[in-house]
Swiss-Prot record:
It catalyses: 3 ATP = 5'-triphosphoadenylyl-(2'->5')-adenylyl-(2'->5')-adenosine + 2 diphosphate. The keyword Zinc does not apply. One of its GO terms (biological process) is antiviral innate immune response. Mg(2+) binds at D81, D83, D154. Gene3D superfamilies: 2'-5'-oligoadenylate synthetase 1, domain 2, Beta Polymerase, domain 2, Phosphatidylinositol 3-kinase Catalytic Subunit, Chain A, domain 1. This is 2'-5'-oligoadenylate synthase-like protein 2. The lineage of its organism: Eukaryota, Metazoa, Chordata, Craniata, Vertebrata. It comes from the Eukaryota. GO terms for cellular component: cytosol; membrane; nucleoplasm. Its cofactor is Mg(2+). GO terms for molecular function: 2'-5'-oligoadenylate synthetase activity; ATP binding; double-stranded RNA binding; metal ion binding. The gene is Oasl2. Keywords: Antiviral defense, ATP-binding, Immunity, Innate immunity, Magnesium, Metal-binding, Nucleotide-binding, Nucleotidyltransferase, RNA-binding, Transferase. CDD domains: NT_2-5OAS_ClassI-CCAase, Ubl1_OASL, Ubl2_OASL.
Length: 511
């Protein structure tokens, strides 16, 4: 493919034809890519590690996974990038992989150079630029036997973290705990999750894969060609952003127009400073270590595009996004983007402010049935309060609070957002209606649960006991209330005890 076809000069409603005749891999190219893959794979399985010790041990190839565009089903014609992930028995942990990867890559390189004549292809081992970090792959340039094109293949030795992979199940959260605690360079261990990355893309409809091809072609011809020396966001980052645009703009439908989808992606790239994208398909907020890590990740500077398979891999942190936005803005003025219709992704970004997904909020109030609403984690909490007040027909001052597992109950300020409190997933909130001069106090039960109560600041502790009993709490016989470690008498006055708004009082059983 010496001369790349002109996307910008193609009318939007002709993009299907353009893709089919210019970008779809042709049979001869696919067959040659397949043959090269099979020969290299056979070399690793049957020759590379046979009859020789590596790291003082016999090394076995546990499995070989095809990644990259070819593995995901989004390759371009005569532009093939194949990732061959070698899961090796010599790696028993992420830390061991980090320590021994260079030795393994050097060994593979020497064996390939020694045996490349037997592979029936002209193979060149590309030299990586010297840098602070050890390369995680070995790049091969394989000369096509039927054209002047080059098949690029990255060989990535990896730790088999997933074990027996099941595409329909979430990995055990302990796998991600180990990944996070390893504290490696962000995304450095992503090859261990290549099967998840591949399935995340490969399982999508054919029409979406065609849109992915179109976006990747744009990245190749108009970004990489124009900004050859710049560090640009990866193709994988653009793939994930395209999938997000499709999910939001079509509600994951396979019935859409390519030009509308392409325009939606360009608009997202133009507004990259609003992007915060993540999925909970393979990891979520249930595990404490993972939850705390994700909260910190999602508080970072935009754009944020978390790898759905590897939470340490924020694909938005790397590359000159301003150059991408500049080219996307120019692209939107070209023939390929002249379309009468638009996807609703921009509206979604206004609704899912800053491009983040809505949080499911379960609203609870004593004496009333709980209910659920969706809200944006970056939207002011005062807007959330207004929705609750209207839905529940409340007329007093609305006080809302939440409690992390094992933590103290915290009031939610209307001047802040849920994201300010690190809330990006499902959350239960307690609603309390107060009338001046009432304050809100929290009572902590022995099991760790905190409940809010509205009470006059001049009321006695006995009045608070009455409210606790009305709420279904224990009676005073076998229990005491403590504040800052001191037992409270029934006749004590809250104001005299200097108990202020949002203070916590401990409920404790008499020993």
């Amino acid at each position: 493919m010496d001369t790349l076809p002109d996307l910008y000069g193609t009318v939007g409603d002709s993009l299907d034809y353009f893709l089919e005749h210019s970008l779809q891999p042709q049979r001869d190219w696919k067959e040659e890519g397949k043959d090269a893959w099979e020969r290299i794979e056979r070399f690793f399985r049957e020759k590379c590690f046979c009859d020789e010790l590596l790291l003082d041990q016999e090394v076995r190839v546990l499995k070989v996974v095809k990644g990259g565009s070819s593995g995901k089903g989004t390759a371009l014609n005569h532009r093939s990038d194949q990732d061959m992930i070698l899961f090796l028995s010599c790696f028993s942990s992420f830390k061991q992989q980090a320590r021994d990867r260079k030795a393994v890559i050097d060994f593979i390189k020497s064996k390939l150079i020694h045996c490349r004549k037997s592979l029936a292809y002209n193979i060149t081992v590309r030299q990586h630029k010297e840098g602070k970090r050890t390369p995680r792959s070995l790049t091969l340039e394989i000369q096509s036997r039927k054209s002047n094109d080059i098949i690029c293949m990255d060989i990535l030795p990896a730790y088999n973290a997933l074990g027996s992979f099941s595409r329909d199940c979430k990995p055990e959260p302990e796998i991600y705990e180990n990944l996070i605690r390893c504290k490696g360079y962000p995304g450095d261990f992503s090859p261990s999750f290549a099967e998840l990355q591949r399935h995340f893309v490969k399982s999508r409809p054919v029409k979406l894969k065609n849109l992915l091809r179109l976006v990747k072609f744009w990245h190749l011809k108009y970004l990489r060609h124009k900004y050859r020396r710049a560090v640009l966001p990866s193709k994988y980052a653009l793939e994930l952003l395209t999938i997000y645009a499709w999910e939001m703009g079509t509600d994951s439908s396979d019935n859409f127009n390519l030009d509308e989808g392409f325009v939606a992606v360009m608009e997202l790239l133009r507004d990259y400073q609003d992007i915060c994208i993540y999925w909970t398909k393979y990891y979520d907020f249930q595990n404490e270590v993972v939850r705390n890590f994700l909260k910190e990740q999602l508080k970072g500077d935009r754009p944020i595009i978390l790898d759905p398979a590897d939470p340490t891999n924020n694909l938005g942190r790397r590359g000159k996004w301003e150059l991408v936005a500049k080219e996307a803005t120019y692209c939107l003025l070209q023939l390929c983007c002249v379309t009468a219709d638009r996807w609703n992704v921009q509206v979604s970004i206004a609704h899912y402010l800053r491009g983040a997904r809505d949080v499911q909020v379960t609203v609870k109030q004593t004496g009333r049935e709980e209910w659920i609403l969706l809200t944006n984690p970056h939207s002011p909490i005062r807007k959330l309060k207004a929705k609750i007040k209207k839905r529940m027909n409340l007329c007093g001052e609305l006080r809302i609070s939440f409690q992390e597992p094992g933590g103290e109950r915290q009031p939610l300020s209307g001047r802040k957002t849920l994201s300010d409190y690190g809330i990006f997933s499902k959350v239960n909130i307690r609603v309390m209606e107060t009338f001046p001069p009432e304050i809100q106090v929290f009572v902590r039960y022995p099991g760790g649960q905190n409940k809010p109560f509205a009470i006059d600041p001049d009321a006695t502790i006995l009045s608070l006991w009455e409210k606790i009993e009305e709420d279904g709490g224990p009676c005073t016989e076998d229990w005491v209330l403590l504040f800052e470690g001191e037992e409270l008498d029934d006749d004590d006055n809250l104001a005299e005890l200097q108990i202020k708004d949002c203070d916590t009082i401990q409920l404790s059983r008499v020993s």
